[in-house]
């Protein structure tokens, strides 16, 4: 499996057994100025997250694309 990974936002080969791609987003103190923090990566299962953290998981190559842009 290949997934996009931060910080480079480039497609990388996942380690053996990690067949899920994920996109995790959350806000910190700078969210209103910089936007949400984004983490892209691979996992064996869809990661569990705490309240306030959004996660999207998928299982095809490079399915976790995220459009990075300038905050408004």
From Swiss-Prot:
PROSITE patterns documented for this protein: SNAKE_TOXIN
SUPFAM superfamilies per record: Snake toxin-like
InterPro entries linked: Snake_3FTx, Snake_toxin-like_sf, Snake_toxin_con_site, Toxin_cobra-type
Tissue specificity as recorded in UniProt: Expressed by the venom gland.
Keywords of the record: Acetylcholine receptor inhibiting toxin, Disulfide bond, Ion channel impairing toxin, Neurotoxin, Postsynaptic neurotoxin, Secreted, Toxin
Annotated disulfide bonds: 3-21, 14-42, 27-31, 46-57, 58-63
Entry superkingdom: Eukaryota
A Pfam match: Toxin_cobra-type
GO cellular component, one term: extracellular region
Annotated Gene3D superfamilies: CD59
UniProt-recorded Gene Ontology molecular function terms: acetylcholine receptor inhibitor activity; ion channel regulator activity; toxin activity
Protein's cellular compartments: Secreted
Principal location class: secreted
Annotated family: Belongs to the three-finger toxin family. Long-chain subfamily. Type II alpha-neurotoxin sub-subfamily.
Role played: Binds with high affinity to muscular (alpha-1/CHRNA1) and neuronal (alpha-7/CHRNA7) nicotinic acetylcholine receptor (nAChR) and inhibits acetylcholine from binding to the receptor, thereby impairing neuromuscular and neuronal transmission.
Protein's recorded name: Alpha-elapitoxin-Dpp2c
Organism: Dendroaspis polylepis polylepis (Black mamba)
């Amino acid at each position: 499996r290949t997934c996009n990974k931060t910080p480079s936002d480039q497609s990388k080969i996942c380690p053996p057994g990690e067949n899920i791609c994920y996109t995790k987003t959350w806000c910190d103190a700078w969210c209103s100025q910089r936007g949400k923090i984004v983490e892209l990566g691979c996992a064996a299962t869809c990661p569990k997250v705490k309240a306030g953290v959004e996660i999207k998981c998928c299982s095809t190559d490079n399915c976790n694309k995220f459009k990075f842009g300038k905050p408004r």
